[in-house]
Amino acid sequence: MQEHFGSYAEYVTRSSFGQVMTVITNHEAQLGIIPCDNHEMNLKPWWSGFSSTGEGLKIIAKLPFLKRKENPLTESDVYVVALTHPAQSGDDVSLLGIEVNNDVSVSTIVEALENAGYRNPKIQLMAKVDDENKSYLAEVDGFLKPNDDGLKPLRAQFNNINIVGSYARPIEL
């Protein structure tokens, strides 16, 4: 992370998203870093604590921002979390937290997102909520503003759906 924030940036490690969230919401840190992969921190749906409207945590970036095609495995992708709304870049990806019953398939979610007009939906993470429900973190192309009209028809299909944040699409060199 030092190559993205500079060698003088101070950082501390936390073992759970709850700890990261507490440090940020208590203003002990300005940014949090959450792994994008199946890291043990992602066994619980941390994204369900994000609100589509109002103040609160949002994903504002994805790192690394510059990716080299010849060496794609240099570091793992991470989301940057902060107590601010993301800025629109013109080439963005938005993240949605979607909670459904266990019997709802990934293909059903992707199809519902496409039918609502969202482009290029991809499921990034899945975590069990309880014995009857699961939660997905999905990416769609474009910058979504709070209370995006496309979410209205989806609210009837899913137990819950909210905008978790947006980030500028990383550049491949």
Feature-to-residue mapping (PLM):
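Domain-level signature for soluble enzymes in the chorismate/prephenate branch of the shikimate pathway
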Residues: 1-173
